[in-house]
Structure formats: C-alpha cells, structure tokens
Amino acid sequence: MGKYFGTDGIRGVAGEDLTVELAYKLARAACYKLKDVDNKLIVIGKDTRISGDMLEAALISGITSMGFDVYRLGVIPTPAVAYLTRFYNACCGIVISASHNPYEFNGIKYFSNEGFKLKDSLEEEIEYLIDHQDEIDLKVTGEKVGRVYEEECARDTYINYLLSRVDLDLTGVKVSLDCGYGATSEIAPIIFNRLNADVTVTNTEYDGKNINFKCGSTNPEVISNLVKISESDMGFSFDGDGDRLIACDETGEIMDGDHVICAVGHFLKENNKLKNNAVVGTVMTNIGLIKSLKEIGVDVIKTQVGDRYVLEEMRKNGYIIGGEQSGHIIFIEDNTTGDGILSAIKLAEIAVKSKQKLSEMNNLMTSFPQVLVNAKVNNEYKKVYKDDEVINQKIAELEHEFKDEGRVLIRPSGTEPLIRVMIEGENQEYLEKKAIELKDLIEERCELI
C-alpha cells in the first residue's frame, strides 16, 4: 500500500482524510498519466453517501481542467461502472464509494479502460504526482476544456446487460432483497421484477446517511428475518456499493461467499463448464469449501486476502469463478470485478436449472467454525512477529495439533495497527480459547521488542 492508495483505492473520512483538495489533485494526476489517450472520456459513478456529490464535484473540476470529458452515471453499483467504462469506450472509470463502511467514510477507486483495477505501479506514479502538482505541465484553455454530460441511459444499459447474462424466469418464486440503502436500491428490485419474481424489498429509501446502517451484507440477520417473515424462496443482501452478495436460503440460513462459490463450483463441474477444474479463493477460504470441492475433484486456488488478488490469479491462469467469504464473487466471463446483483441472479439461475432449493445448495458444504481476534500492536511491529521464535513455535504447535482438520492464519491489517489472528477448526469454544492465547502472546512479544 502507498501513501494514499490502499488495497481498494483511496479511502477515509470524507472532508478529513479524503478532502476535496485531495480529490482534485488525484483527478489531475490521473489525467496527466492518461494525457496521450485518444478518447479523453471518463465515467463517474457513486453510491448514496452524502459526501458523494462533494467529492464528485472536485473530481470533475480536476478532470475537465485537464481537457477530459465526463459522463456522470449517478448512483450506480461499482460493477456497473466497471462494465460501463468498457461500454462507453472510456479511458477510465471512477467510483466514489467506501463499500461497506459507515456513511461518514468515502473512497475513490479507478478502473482501467478494460474495467480492471489499476496496477500498483500506476497507482504509485499517480501518488507521486498528487504530491508534485508542479510537475503537471499541462494547461488547458478555451475549447479544449472538458465538458460534463448526464448519462441518463447508464442504469438501463447496465440492467439490460445483466439480464442478458442469464436464462432465467422466476415466475412463482418469492425473492427477498436487502439493498442496504446503497447503490443497488433502485436497480436490484427492477431486475428481479423483470425476471418475474415475487419481490419483497427492504432498505431502499436512502438519505445519504443510512447506507449500511444495521443492514446490508454485513448484517445478514436482516435478510434472514425478511426471508422468514415473507416466506421467500431465497434472499439476497448487498453492500453499499453493490459488489458483494450474501445470500439466504428459504429456511433463513445464510450463504456467505464461500457457500455461494461452492454451489457454483458444483454446478459448473456437473455440467462440464468449470475451466481448469478449479475455483479461486483466499487464505481465509473456509476449509469446508475446500473439502466439499475436493470430493468432486475440484481444486481451490488460494491467494492473499483481497478481491484484486483473486482477480489477478483468475486472469493469469484462466479460472472463471472466484471470490471471498465476505461476498466478493467474480464471474470473470461476465464482469471484471465482484458484482452482487450478477452473483444473485446467477445463483437463482443455478437453483432453477438444477431444480434445487437454496437450502440444498447451502448444504453442499459444512463451514468449519472460524474465530477471528485482533492483536493490537504499533504499526512498526506489524511484520516483526514473523521472526519471533516464541510466536512461531506456538503457531507450529497449533497447526500440528489440527493437522488437516484446522489451521492458524496470522496477518497484519493493511489499514489499522492490528495483527489479525484467525483459527479454524471443529470446536468453537476451544478455538476461542486458543485464539485469545495467541493474541495475548503476540501483544506481549511485540511489547518486548
């Protein structure tokens, strides 16, 4: 990670960490790196946060001052921006969103002209120019100044594209949706109504401050309760910017990203459509998923945590399905990033075609309990633990004890002064005890350094 860019763009408290001055400088820096492109067009979308308008105005000022035109897409999911960047042949796309974070946070994320996240090397070059604006030796005046256009067809274009990616009729199927007061609030209900589902919707009346508040993909109990109350056949919950999906079966049981990937993997394998006989997950992927797919001869390729790393592995080796437990699920033949609505209609399509209830698909794997605790350490010590013999000995003892029925994963947080401790196994109470012991040991050893 750099000075400004994290693993998913630039993010922080709007007006404090992420200021209009930074947004303006970022826009100019990125445009300067793109100054030689033929099509000087940039598309911008945003979620429902109150600070979105403020940051959008700053970005547009910077972009147009560099001679680039802007298509304003309005409130629209992140994956829609990735798709529409390609559709409009734009030189890049910008999303203003902080995903699942509270409303006071916001973020700015760029997509390349192909709809992929920017390479680390390009982000580093942009960061340099943010801090060295005097090196942007480009002055635009007169008719060369950029223009701004309201792209009113953007939402319908994206809706029609998603509908074209499935062969699905949900007549007679009850579907519940939790839109988390976010970017899917208008689009998701339209899509499921177009698919003839009997739709029950909650959390769509956004006000700029209620995004993700006690709802959405990080609060799955909401969709579970809605499915039970409405007696729905399936439920889908999205995060603020619409790139995550958490599903729910007809009994109210949650299907996280691992369970969804498991269901998709089984279906593709059974229908001889799973390229390279593997799916892509991360080091946090539940052992239950690995065991379930192994039984049918499917491998799980693991990357470091982050959907960008999952995508890199998929592109590099030709895998077509991958994702994270958190609900980032990538169907690379359909879009270049995680797409919550796409994942939902794909899962519904599999249920209809296989004539299965979601509960049957959910039961294809049994999740091993996972305990996650955070050891608080100073940032300068976040990587020192790797060389500590006492910590490594404790980890080795636990891993030997678990063998193939559990594991220990230690990783430093990319954004906070924390070391995350995850232990996975069969006994929840035992795992909690061992996780706290290891957390305390890490904190103690880091204090001694």
Swiss-Prot record:
Q: State the free-text cofactor note.
A: Binds 1 Mg(2+) ion per subunit.
Q: Which residues bind Mg(2+)?
A: 99, 239, 241, 243
Coiled-coil blocks: none
Record Pfam families: PGM_PMM_I (PF02878), PGM_PMM_II (PF02879), PGM_PMM_III (PF02880), PGM_PMM_IV (PF00408)
Q: Which cofactor does it need?
A: Mg(2+)
Per the record, its GO cellular-component terms are: cytosol
Q: Where is the active site?
A: 99 (phosphoserine intermediate)
Q: What is its EC number?
A: 5.4.2.10
Q: Any idea which residues bear Phosphoserine here?
A: 99
Is Phosphoprotein one of the keywords UniProt gives this record? yes
| Maturation and modification | Activated by phosphorylation.
Name one molecular function that GO assigns to this entry: phosphomannomutase activity
Q: Give the reaction(s) catalysed.
A: alpha-D-glucosamine 1-phosphate = D-glucosamine 6-phosphate
Top EC class per UniProt?
A: isomerase
Single GO BP term: UDP-N-acetylglucosamine biosynthetic process
Keywords, A to Z? Isomerase, Magnesium, Metal-binding, Phosphoprotein
Domain of life, per the record? Bacteria
Could you tell me what this protein does?
A: Catalyzes the conversion of glucosamine-6-phosphate to glucosamine-1-phosphate.
Query: PANTHER family this protein is in?
Result: PHOSPHOGLUCOMUTASE (ALPHA-D-GLUCOSE-1,6-BISPHOSPHATE-DEPENDENT) (PTHR42946:SF1), PHOSPHOHEXOSE MUTASE (PTHR42946)
Give the family this protein belongs to, as stated in its UniProt record: Belongs to the phosphohexose mutase family.
Q: What's the protein called, per UniProt?
A: Phosphoglucosamine mutase
